């Protein structure tokens, strides 16, 4: 069984037992969270598509860790004007382990 969930403005295809990295969620490590924004649930040939969410569907996940992604380097330059600007950014993430999908 798999599901498509929405969290942090992004969509993820998940299945039970998988680990995913999502935008940072304010939850303690080891705590269990429930994601109720389930856009689609599928199992074999049967697929339920929500309008916009599947009613009664939920995904239970456990917070494994918090961290920061690798640095993304931004470099801006204007040719012939001697203008250069360096900038870097590291995005925070939360790693989740998907425990169960209920539809």
From Swiss-Prot:
| UniProt-listed GO biological process terms | translation
Q: Which InterPro entries match?
A: bL21-like (IPR028909), bL21-like_sf (IPR036164), Ribosomal_bL21 (IPR001787), Ribosomal_bL21_CS (IPR018258)
Q: Which UniProt keywords apply?
A: Ribonucleoprotein, Ribosomal protein, RNA-binding, rRNA-binding
* Molecular function GO terms recorded: rRNA binding; structural constituent of ribosome
Q: Does the keyword RNA-binding apply?
A: yes
Subunit composition?
Part of the 50S ribosomal subunit. Contacts protein L20.
Query: Into which family does the record put it?
Result: Belongs to the bacterial ribosomal protein bL21 family.
Role, per record: This protein binds to 23S rRNA in the presence of protein L20.
Entry-linked PANTHER family: 50S RIBOSOMAL PROTEIN L21, LARGE RIBOSOMAL SUBUNIT PROTEIN BL21M
Q: What is the protein's given name?
A: Large ribosomal subunit protein bL21
Species for this entry:
Azoarcus sp. (strain BH72)
Gene responsible for this protein? rplU
């Amino acid at each position: 069984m798999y599901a498509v969930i929405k969290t942090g403005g992004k969509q993820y295809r998940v299945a039970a037992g998988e680990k995913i990295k999502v935008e940072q969620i304010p939850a303690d490590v080891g705590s269990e969270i429930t994601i109720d924004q389930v856009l689609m649930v599928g199992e074999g040939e049967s697929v339920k598509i929500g309008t916009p969410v599947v009613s009664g569907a939920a995904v239970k996940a456990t917070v494994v860790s918090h961290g920061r992604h690798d640095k993304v380097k931004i470099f801006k330059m204007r040719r012939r004007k001697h203008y250069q600007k360096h900038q870097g950014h590291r995005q925070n993430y939360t790693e989740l382990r998907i425990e169960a999908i209920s539809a």
